[in-house]
UniProtKB/Swiss-Prot annotation:
It is found in: Plastid, Chloroplast thylakoid membrane. Its main location: plastid. Photoregulated by reversible phosphorylation of its threonine residues. The keyword Metal-binding applies. Keywords: Chlorophyll, Chloroplast, Chromophore, Magnesium, Membrane, Metal-binding, Phosphoprotein, Photosynthesis, Photosystem I, Photosystem II, Plastid, Thylakoid. This is Chlorophyll a-b binding protein 22, chloroplastic. Binds at least 14 chlorophylls (8 Chl-a and 6 Chl-b) and carotenoids such as lutein and neoxanthin. One of its GO terms (biological process) is photosynthesis. It comes from Pisum sativum. GO terms for cellular component: chloroplast thylakoid membrane; photosystem I; photosystem II.
């Protein structure tokens, strides 16, 4: 799962988005 602080596809609407 996408969690803040982890580079993940923003398509999930989560993560920092970096």
């Amino acid at each position: 799962l996408a969690v803040p602080g982890i580079l993940v596809p923003e398509a999930l609407g989560l993560g920092n988005x970096v």
